[in-house]
Amino acid sequence: MKTLVIVIHPNLETSVVNKTWMNRLKQEKDITVHDLYGEYPNFIIDVEKEQQLLLDHERIVFQFPMYWYSSPALLKQWEDDVLTHGWAYGTGGTKLHGKELLLAISLGAQESDYQAGGEYNITISELIRPFQVTANYIGMRFLPAFTQYGTLHLSKEDVKNSAERLVDYLKAEH
C-alpha cells in the first residue's frame, strides 16, 4: 500500500524521536516522507501539490509531537488550506473517500499520564478526536494511532526500536 507520511515538527533538527522515525521511514520504498515545516516554513502551502500527494497514496499518516495536547500549528493550517470544499467534502468532495488516515504521535509524558485519574485526566483517544471527526467527514477510514510515550527518557536503542515498530505498524493491515 502506498503510504504518505506527513511529518509535522517545527524543530525537526533538534528532534530525536521524530527525526529518527522520519529517517527510518525514508528507507521504505512504498512510503513517501513529506516534511511539512521543511517545505513550508512560512506557512504558505501549495494546495495543488498537497492534494496531488494525497491522491497518489492510499494511506495518509500525520507524524508529529504532541504540543500542548494537540498537533503543531502548521498541520491545522494545512488542513484548512488543503481539505477544501468540493475536493475533500461537500458537493463533489469525494477525492479522499476510502483512503486511510492514521496518526504517529510522540509524547514526552508517560502513558499513565493520559488516562482517567492520570496527570492530564484525559486519554489520547479523546485528544485526537478532532482528527477522527475530520477523517469521518471527508470519507476516510480513521485507524488507531501509533503512540510513543515517554520520549524524554528513551535510550538511543529505545528510539531505534520505536522507529522499527512504526515501520511495522505502517506496513500492517488495519
Curated annotation (Swiss-Prot):
The organism's place on the tree of life at top rank: Bacteria
InterPro entries (alphabetical): Flavodoxin_fold, Flavoprotein-like_sf, KefG/KefF
Enzyme class name: oxidoreductase
Gene3D superfamilies: 3.40.50.360
Any one GO MF annotation of this record: FMN binding
Keyword Oxidoreductase: yes
Record-linked Pfam families: Flavodoxin_2
Family designation: Belongs to the NAD(P)H dehydrogenase (quinone) family.
Name of this protein: Uncharacterized NAD(P)H oxidoreductase YrkL
Organism: Bacillus subtilis (strain 168)
